[in-house]
Swiss-Prot record:
Cystine connections: none
Keywords, ordered alphabetically: Chloroplast, Plastid, Ribonucleoprotein, Ribosomal protein, RNA-binding, rRNA-binding
InterPro entries xrefs: Ribosomal_uS7, Ribosomal_uS7_bac/org-type, Ribosomal_uS7_CS, Ribosomal_uS7_dom, Ribosomal_uS7_dom_sf
PANTHER family: RIBOSOMAL PROTEIN S7 (PTHR11205)
Protein's recorded name: Small ribosomal subunit protein uS7c
Molecular function via GO: rRNA binding; structural constituent of ribosome
Pfam families linked: Ribosomal_S7
Family: Belongs to the universal ribosomal protein uS7 family.
Gene Ontology CC terms: chloroplast; small ribosomal subunit
Superkingdom field: Eukaryota
Record keyword rRNA-binding present: yes
Organism listed in the record: Trochodendron aralioides (Wheel tree)
């Protein structure tokens, strides 16, 4: 048994312009090489592009996209008796949001396009509508969990 206690969950601080935690979470995940100001620029440009494309509140589009991509269950590899099984596990809201943001950014980076702000805005709009690579990833994860339902008792 480990002697260490469990780490306290840190709550993300709100960003300076929109006062939104999701924006801060996105900024911290998009961050590369410690260039936080560049990460903020990318996010804010993407939010402006969403505003222009949809002509609605861009934060509601962001919230809707993240809610649409957030998985309920996932599979975890578990070694039982010499063979590895994919065991379906339920995911908490914080971990689900983190996964959703990671998938959205991954799908955005894979997209063809001019710059990251453009690609991110396109992916967020698609995810809010219920299409896009990130949504496909969520559905694939749910399918995997459903297929391996027989191993749920290994939790």
């Amino acid at each position: 048994m480990s002697r260490r206690g469990t780490a306290e969950e840190k709550t993300a601080k709100s960003d300076p312009i929109y006062r939104n935690r999701l924006v801060t979470m996105l900024v911290n995940r998009i961050l590369k090489h410690g260039k936080k100001s560049l990460a903020y620029q990318i996010i804010y440009r993407a939010v402006k592009k969403i505003q222009q494309k949809t002509e609605t509140n861009p934060l509601s589009v962001l919230r809707q996209a993240i809610r649409g991509v957030t998985p309920d269950i996932a599979v975890k590899a578990r070694r039982v008796g010499g063979s590895t099984h994919q065991v379906p596990i339920e995911i908490g809201s914080t971990q689900g949001k983190a996964l959703a943001i990671r998938w959205l950014l991954g799908a955005s980076r894979k997209r063809p396009g001019r710059n990251m702000a453009f690609k991110l805005s396109s992916e967020l709009v698609d995810a809010a509508k219920g299409s896009g690579d990130a949504i496909r990833k969520k559905e694939e994860t749910h399918r995997m969990a459903e297929a391996n339902r027989a191993f749920a008792h290994f939790r």
